[in-house]
Amino acid sequence: MNTFPAPAKLNLFLHVIGRRDDGYHLLQTVFRFIGYSDQLGFDVTNDGVIRHLNLVPGLTDTDDLCVRAAKLLQKRSGKEMLGVGIHLSKNIPLGGGLGGGSSDAATTLIVLNRLWGINWGRERLMALGLELGADVPIFIYGRNAFAEGVGEKLEVINLPPAWYVVLTPPAPISTAAVFASRELTRNTIPIKMAAFSMAQGHNDLELVAMRLQPVIAEWLDWLKGRHGSTKVAMSGSGSCVFAEFPSESAAREVLRQLPDSMSGFIAPGLARHPLSDF
C-alpha cells in the first residue's frame, strides 16, 4: 500500500473582518504548509465499500473526514462500484488549529481522484472540498496563499524560507465554540496583501481561545520569551502555538529549551503542498 502525505498548515495571521447572513465568518489569513504530516494509505477495491482500516481514537465514522471525503467523491463522480480501504497514520494533533482533518480529507480527494480514474481538475476538487470544510480547499490548491471569504478565495503568496517551533498544548479546542463566542472580534479592518507586512498581522481568535483554554496563554508566553523569533502566534482556532525562525539551528535550540511539562516539534516551512503536482 503506497502512502501519501497530508501536511499541517499554519495561519501566519488570521483576521475576522465580518460575518455573512448565513452565519459564516469572513476572514483574511495567510496559510503556510509545513513539513509535518499525517500519512495516508489507500487500497482500492471493486466492492463499492469505503472502509477506514484504523479509525483514530476519539473519532467516529460520522466524524471521519477521510471517509466523508471518499463517499462524497464516490457519489458525485458516479464511481459507486469502486471502494477503498483507508489507513491513516496520525501525527497532527486533533483540535490544534493545524488543519489535520482538512488536510486528510484533501489528500483523500486528490489521491482517489487519480486512483479511481476520475481525473477532475483542481478547481472542481476544491469546490467539492469546500462542502467538507472551509480549510479543505487550501490543501487541494497546493500553494501557500493569502485567503479571503470563508477561506476559499485564494491567491498564491511567495514566502521566504523559515523554520517553526510548534507547541501542542494538551487542550483541544472546538472551532465552533471559538467562532460562536460573543467576545470574538468580528470587525478587523480588511487589508490589501500587497501593502501588508506579515509582522503586522495577528490572530483575532487568540483571546477567545485563551479564555476557553488558559494553558494556551502560558505556552504562548513561553514562546514569546525566546530570542530570535520573527513571529509568535496561535494557529487557526488553536490550541497549537508557534514561533517562526530564520534557520533550523535556531528552531532546534528553542526546542532544546522546552520544559518537560510542554510538548512540541519543529518543522520547515514548505514552498508548496507535496502533492501539488500529483
Swiss-Prot record:
The active site is at K9, D135. InterPro entries: GHMP_kinase_C_dom, GHMP_kinase_C_sf, GHMP_kinase_N_dom, IspE, Ribosomal_Su5_D2-typ_SF, Ribsml_uS5_D2-typ_fold_subgr. Disulfide bonds: none annotated. Pathway: Isoprenoid biosynthesis; isopentenyl diphosphate biosynthesis via DXP pathway; isopentenyl diphosphate from 1-deoxy-D-xylulose 5-phosphate: step 3/6. Pfam families: GHMP_kinases_C, GHMP_kinases_N. GO terms for biological process: isopentenyl diphosphate biosynthetic process, methylerythritol 4-phosphate pathway; terpenoid biosynthetic process. Signal peptide: none annotated. Transmembrane segments: none annotated. Its EC number is 2.7.1.148. ATP binds at P93, L94, G95, G96, G97, L98, G99, G100, G101, S102, S103. The keyword Kinase applies. Keywords: ATP-binding, Isoprene biosynthesis, Kinase, Nucleotide-binding, Transferase. GO terms for molecular function: 4-(cytidine 5'-diphospho)-2-C-methyl-D-erythritol kinase activity; ATP binding. It catalyses: 4-CDP-2-C-methyl-D-erythritol + ATP = 4-CDP-2-C-methyl-D-erythritol 2-phosphate + ADP + H(+). The keyword Ion transport does not apply. It is an enzyme of class 2 (transferase). Belongs to the GHMP kinase family. IspE subfamily. PANTHER family: 4-DIPHOSPHOCYTIDYL-2-C-METHYL-D-ERYTHRITOL KINASE, CHLOROPLASTIC. Catalyzes the phosphorylation of the position 2 hydroxy group of 4-diphosphocytidyl-2C-methyl-D-erythritol. NCBIfam families: ispE (TIGR00154), PRK14608.1 (NF011202). This is 4-diphosphocytidyl-2-C-methyl-D-erythritol kinase. It comes from Nitrosomonas eutropha (strain DSM 101675 / C91 / Nm57). The gene is ispE.
